[in-house]
Amino acid sequence: MNTVLDIVLHAPDAEGLQRARMNAVNALRAAPQTQVRIIANAAAVEAALNTPHPQADALTYLCPNSLNALGRTATAPLQVLGEPAVLALARLQKHGWAYIRS
């Protein structure tokens, strides 16, 4: 099956971020043409900042509200969403991305 998939992995906490990272790496290994985004909010934002992941950080988008609440800034390759995570998740789903809560 050669269908290109767009997958958004939602990580709301540290454990979810760990699962999302593993799922992203596994999905891309099995189907390199897949588009994968990890959207981290709440406790997952702090986990992403504190625990770098060379394979998944470039795919990881942080909620600006969670980042501001922590009083921290993100460094590349981590990216910051241009809107709250809840809106980004809804927008991606509206555009056909498959949502998976990690």
Predicted segments with their positions:
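Secreted/extracellular ectodomain signature
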Residues: 1-102
